[in-house]
C-alpha cells in the first residue's frame, strides 16, 4: 500500500509540474491574468492560470455553454447567495459542480445544480420523494447550498477551505489542517493531505470567476448568444393537476413547463 501511494504521489507531482509548465508558458505568451476586483480575494498563481488557459482552449466550448446557461440563472441565484452572506463568487462553484445544469447527476448519485447527495440534501431541508426532487430546484437548492457553505466557513474560518470542504467533505479538510498544521489552502496543496481532485477543484472555481468577470476580454461573446428562458413568476396550485393540463391552461408546451419546474 505504501509503495502504491508513493507511485501515486510521484505521478501527481509529475502531472502537477507539467501543468505548471503549461500555465507558465501560457502566461508568457498571453500576459498575466488581469487582477480581479470582486468581494472575494482571488489568488492568481500557476494552478489557477492553468485552468484559465484550459477553459480558453481545450475546454472552450464547454465553458461557453456554461457561461450562456449562467446568464439565465445568475439573476435568480446570486441575490440568494448575497442575502445569505455568501460571496457572489460562489455562483461559479455551482458552475464547476454541474455546469449550472439542474439535471446534472454524478456516478456518486449527486444531483442538481449544486450536486447534493441525498443525505446532505435532506439534512438541509430539501424534499426528495417519488414526486419531487428539490435538489433540481435552482432556488431551494441554492438556499440549502448557501446554508451549508456558511456552516463550512464558520467551521473552517476561510472561504477557500470552505470550497475545498464542499468538494472533499469537512472531515477530510479538518484532518488536513490538523495534520499539516496549516489553514492555508495553497500550503495544503503542497502536502499529501488533500486529494488531487480537491487540489484542482478550488483553482477551477477561481479560474471560472476570473473568466466570467470579463468574458469578452477572453474571447467569449456571451451576449451574442441567446440564453434559455427562465420563468420568474410563481403560481400556487391549490389542488392536484396534471402537468399537461396546466401547461395547456398557461398556453405553453409541457417541455417548457417542465423546464421551469425541473424538480418535478
Task: Explain the meaning of each model-derived region.
Residues 59-99, 143-152, 235:
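Export/targeting segments at the very N-terminus of extracytoplasmic proteins
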Residues 223-251:
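Primarily a LysM-type cell-wall glycan-binding module
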Residues 98-101, 120-123, 169-172, 212, ...:
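Solvent-exposed loop/turn segments at secondary-structure junctions
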Residues 1-85:
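An acidic, Gly/Ser/Thr/Pro-rich helix-cap/linker signature
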Amino acid at each position: 500500500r505504501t509503495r502504491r501511494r508513493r507511485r501515486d504521489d510521484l505521478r501527481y507531482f509529475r502531472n502537477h509540474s507539467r501543468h505548471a509548465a503549461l500555465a507558465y508558458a501560457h502566461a508568457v505568451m498571453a500576459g498575466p491574468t488581469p487582477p480581479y476586483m470582486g468581494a472575494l480575494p482571488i489568488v492568481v498563481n500557476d494552478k489557477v492560470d492553468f485552468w484559465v488557459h484550459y477553459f480558453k482552449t481545450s475546454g472552450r466550448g464547454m465553458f461557453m455553454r456554461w457561461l450562456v446557461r449562467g446568464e439565465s440563472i445568475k439573476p435568480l441565484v446570486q441575490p440568494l447567495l448575497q442575502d445569505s452572506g455568501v460571496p457572489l463568487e460562489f455562483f461559479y462553484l455551482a458552475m464547476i459542480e454541474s455546469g449550472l445544469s439542474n439535471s446534472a447527476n454524478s456516478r456518486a448519485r449527486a444531483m442538481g445544480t449544486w450536486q447534493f447527495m441525498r443525505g446532505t440534501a435532506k439534512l438541509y431541508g430539501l424534499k426528495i420523494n417519488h414526486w419531487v426532487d428539490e435538489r433540481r430546484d435552482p432556488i431551494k437548492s441554492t438556499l440549502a447550498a448557501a446554508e451549508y457553505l456558511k456552516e463550512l466557513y464558520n467551521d473552517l474560518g476561510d472561504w477557500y477551505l470552505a470550497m475545498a470542504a464542499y468538494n472533499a467533505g469537512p472531515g477530510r479538510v479538518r484532518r488536513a489542517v490538523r495534520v499539516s498544521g496549516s489553514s492555508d489552502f495553497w500550503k495544503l496543496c503542497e502536502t499529501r493531505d488533500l486529494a488531487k481532485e480537491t487540489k484542482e477543484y478550488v483553482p477551477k472555481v477561481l479560474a471560472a470567476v476570473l473568466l466570467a468577470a470579463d468574458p469578452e476580454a477572453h474571447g467569449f461573446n456571451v451576449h451574442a448568444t441567446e440564453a434559455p428562458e427562465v420563468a420568474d413568476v410563481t403560481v400556487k396550485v391549490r389542488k392536484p393537476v396534471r402537468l399537461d393540463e396546466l401547461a395547456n391552461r398557461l398556453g405553453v408546451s409541457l417541455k417548457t413547463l417542465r423546464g421551469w419546474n425541473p424538480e418535478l
